[in-house]
Swiss-Prot record:
Record's keyword terms, sorted: DNA replication, DNA-directed RNA polymerase, Nucleotidyltransferase, Plasmid, Transcription, Transferase
Pfam families the record matches: RepB_primase (PF16793), RepB_primase_C (PF22448)
InterPro entries: RepB-like_DNA_primase_dom, RepB/MobA-like_C
Location of the region described as Disordered in the Swiss-Prot/TrEMBL record: 145-172, 318-352
TM segment ranges: none
Name of the protein described by the UniProt record: DNA primase
Cellular-component GO terms for this entry: DNA-directed RNA polymerase complex
Biased composition (Basic and acidic residues): 318-332
Keyword DNA-binding: no
């Protein structure tokens, strides 16, 4: 008779539709360290298991759980992205679905905490890897864990226990990872977003191909410069956003994303936003995060001009308010002042 873990895997795999599944076991040490073991890894290479091989390996996975280890799946496919949206509460999960995204699988990884896997076909272009990474980054910034990066990412295995020490119950047991939804489908909205991201890469590649040879000889990474006004705008928005946060730990990556969208609304271009984040964001952290700030600034500014485009349009009603925050006259007031000046200049002068 099939075990409950195998039944849950079969429902999950039928929905996600991956070609192979990497299985990772993580042992949580008493001192907080993690010991990681990838079941199929051999000579430094891991390709994952077919669904049939998972069935054969299930008894081994059950033994690992009895030893106190945590089990994870990573879906792998040559022609599909399987995007994990991690660390969602119920509100974020409902918003994801309300906004039109269609997860193939939804997991309750711990009580009140959810993970979703969205399947979307790769476009078959030279930019597939970058598109997948950008798609994961955009969706997690908006709905999940903004620190999560990369399109290929492990998630909790349904049917097995979440053995994080903080989840241990009074009787010594642990909550089981629950498969709440499993439906074989690909997400149309995520495909549209990936097409938009790919088109941006295609445009960049076309522009680069048109550059003269002397320009191509420059270093590949040209950092955007931040004007004084952009830096000042970042700092003003940073103080304003923090002032509006209520209790708990502030997610500074999400704060930077909010600032980037605000600055787009008030008319700063992508390069100026990127430069301001690169220059200002490291100073807002109390400790060194070991982050590549150039890449971080590029991704955050890009987010404001791609995935957050609908959000920026909705927030246009706050433009004048945010322009005042930046210490600038709203555009409408500038236009009125300009019109009044022209009217004065064209009016007949008074003679004494």
């Amino acid at each position: 008779m099939k075990s409950e873990q195998l039944k849950q895997f079969e429902r999950y795999a039928e929905a996600v539709g991956a070609e192979r599944y990497r299985v990772t076991s993580i042992k949580m040490q008493a001192d907080g360290r993690k010991q990681t073991f990838i079941l199929d890894k051999k000579d430094g290479i891991t390709r994952g298991f077919t669904p049939q091989e998972i069935e054969q390996r299930t008894p081994e996975m059950q033994r690992l759980q009895r030893r106190g280890e945590n089990l994870y799946y990573t879906p792998l496919s040559d022609k599909k992205h399987h995007i994990l949206i991690d660390d969602m509460n119920r509100e974020k999960l409902e918003r994801l679905i309300k906004d039109g995204y269609q997860p193939a699988a939804v997991l309750e990884s711990s009580p009140g905490n959810y993970q979703a896997i969205i399947t979307v076909s790769k476009l078959g272009t030279a930019h597939d890897k970058d598109v997948g990474n950008r798609l994961s980054d955009a969706l997690n910034r908006e709905y999940g864990d903004p620190k999560l990066s990369g399109a290929i990412h492990p998630h909790r295995a349904p049917g097995y226990e979440n053995r994080k020490p903080k989840h241990q119950r009074e009787d010594g047991s642990y909550p089981e990872v629950r498969l709440l939804k499993a439906e074989r489908r690909e997400c149309v909205k995520a495909l549209a977003l990936s097409s938009q991201i790919d088109a941006e890469y295609q445009r960049q590649a076309a522009l680069k191909a048109q550059q003269p040879e002397r320009t191509k000889a420059k270093p590949a990474l040209e950092l955007a410069a931040a004007s004084g006004s952009a830096i000042d705008a970042y700092q003003r928005h940073y103080r304003d956003v923090l002032k509006r946060q209520r209790g708990g730990e502030v997610d500074l990556s999400r704060v930077d994303s909010m600032i980037a969208v605000r600055m787009r609304v008030t008319g700063h271009d992508q390069a100026a936003i990127e430069g301001a984040i690169r220059q200002c964001a490291p100073a807002t952290r109390q400790k060194d995060e070991g982050r590549d700030w150039n890449d971080y600034a590029q991704r955050t500014a890009r987010y404001a001009y791609s995935a957050a485009q609908p959000q920026a349009a909705d927030l246009g009603k706050y433009r004048q308010q945010w322009e005042k925050l930046e210490g600038r006259e709203p555009v409408r007031q500038q236009e009125q002042a300009k019109a009044q000046k022209i009217e004065r200049d064209n009016s007949p002068g008074m003679s004494l």
